[in-house]
Amino acid sequence: MRPAVSIALALVALLVLADSARSEPGEPTLMQKLEQFKENVKVFADNIGEKTKAALQELHDSEFSTKTRNWFSEHFKKVKEKLKDTFA
């Protein structure tokens, strides 16, 4: 490992040990705070994922999207038939 990374990890470990040793009984330790932060980030990411999925599904099912897909399909078939007739 690079020295800077090693030093940073050592400092974080010392901070965790120092914080857990001096915290009051009712106050959450640094590890508990980090664990809670991790849970909050996970819930946030899950919510964003669900909302994004719902928005994309709604966009996919919209009238504009359906009409656009149909238009492209029809025109692609026409071009394909023209090319087939031209080069056959």
From Swiss-Prot:
- What's in the keyword line of the UniProt record? Lipid transport, Secreted, Signal, Transport, VLDL
Signal peptide stretch: 1-23
Task: Kindly give the Gene3D superfamilies that the UniProt entry links to this protein.
Answer: Apolipoprotein C-I
What InterPro entries does the record tag this protein with?
ApoC-1_sf, ApoC-I
Q: Which Pfam families does this UniProt record tie to the protein?
A: ApoC-I
Among the entry's GO cellular component annotations, what is one? high-density lipoprotein particle
Give the chief site where it resides. secreted
**Which Gene Ontology molecular function entries are recorded, alphabetically?**
fatty acid binding; phospholipase inhibitor activity
- Where in the cell does this protein reside? Secreted
Which Gene Ontology BP annotations are present? lipid transport; lipoprotein metabolic process; negative regulation of cholesterol transport; negative regulation of lipid catabolic process; negative regulation of very-low-density lipoprotein particle clearance; triglyceride metabolic process; very-low-density lipoprotein particle clearance
Which PANTHER family does the record cross-reference, listed alphabetically? APOLIPOPROTEIN C-I (PTHR16565:SF2)
The protein's job, in short, is: Inhibitor of lipoprotein binding to the low density lipoprotein (LDL) receptor, LDL receptor-related protein, and very low density lipoprotein (VLDL) receptor. Associates with high density lipoproteins (HDL) and the triacylglycerol-rich lipoproteins in the plasma and makes up about 10% of the protein of the VLDL and 2% of that of HDL. Appears to interfere directly with fatty acid uptake and is also the major plasma inhibitor of cholesteryl ester transfer protein (CETP). Binds free fatty acids and reduces their intracellular esterification.
Q: Hey, which family's this protein in?
A: Belongs to the apolipoprotein C1 family.
This protein's name: Apolipoprotein C-I
Q: Which organism is it from?
A: Alligator mississippiensis
